[in-house]
């Protein structure tokens, strides 16, 4: 696939067979609409997902030779430690643990990994259990208790290696004393619907937890800690990435401010309000602890690989950024308008351009009548519909793919959506109302009817969102 002769954005015929991809329904997505452009954006987001493979990152950034474990510019002499224990939870944790066990073998003395994905094979040295996401379940509570118990057994002379990644807050959830688990579950659900960013949500979760905010590290008193993680937050702040085992930089006052900002202070339970008003909600000090954190994958690195893919396809990459945040419908509408204007009028971007972003975060603020049902969808799917709606308003030839890198957008079984400038007219023919779907946060249902949901299944990684937008020459009115 190329961007056409001399990179003009004129389209070449589509190959008969879809490119090799981790997207499971590529044929469906290429069965309608602007097939050539769709193939380009699907190839590019696939390149981004491949670049976000945590196992490959461990192979590249963690070395083990002659008893020395090297990571993050540090040497850890495993011959001098009493035990090596691996603890983790999150969407990318199993992939990290698998690669690490392959590297260290029986030098790992035990551990526990909590995941939400089906376990295809057991690890030899580390137990793997499943729990629930995005709202914690009783399995999440039990997993968190076990992580806490294992950490408490460690002390001076032990090496604790962690693999906490995005999703750990729900998969391993242990409320502080005095806060019922049901109240913590409701807190998670309220925050997910609020439109708050990951950073804001975590500022609350960390102060209503018995293990987050560095509390798990405090339980492993005296142990040396090596954190291996991937970034799913804007700015790659380590106390948001693996906040169980690093020093927390947020405050209880920030948590309370977040709840008030989104109108949730009066919605959370009295026990949570009482806890946040107490000194127990402040995170422990970890000064003097030997803690090393290695960010294996971040959005900027993924974007670089996507750029390489775009060039290989004969198009011109333009990086929008790795720290884009905003409401999904607003972002999608803006990008759809921008792409359509560029296609039809050659400004601000010329045809033959692919716009890229990875590591940012689209959010959805759920607005509904009391008691009304929530639609089926997620931020990337809502963004895709808003893009399609905006792109249809001018004589444009554009396509976009919007994917949550973990394979589950908004907790659904779809990773995102792939649309183009013919999507909105086709939706009208099929009696699918894009305006209603966006207003009712029912983007998943609409995209499913259109055959435009992207399905990957659990990817084993989590670097937030990956977006690609291809701009070809349109018909200037």
Model-based region annotation:
Residues 4-85, 94-103, 137-156, 296-353, ...:
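N-terminal glycine-/serine-/threonine-rich phosphate-binding loop
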Residues 87-89, 112-115, 161-166, 226-233, ...:
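Short beta-strand segments
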Residues 88-119:
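Active-site cofactor/substrate anionic-group-binding motifs, chiefly glycine-
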Residues 114-156, 205:
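Glycine-rich oxoanion-binding loops at beta->alpha junctions
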Residues 179-197, 248-263, 369-400:
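Gly/Ser/Thr-rich active-site loops/lids in small-molecule metabolic enzymes
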Residues 192, 198-264:
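A glycine/threonine-rich phosphate-anchoring loop and its flanking beta-alpha core
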Residues 220-226, 247-334:
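Accessory alpha-helical/coil subdomains and C-terminal extensions
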Residues 376-477:
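Internal helix-turn-beta structural module
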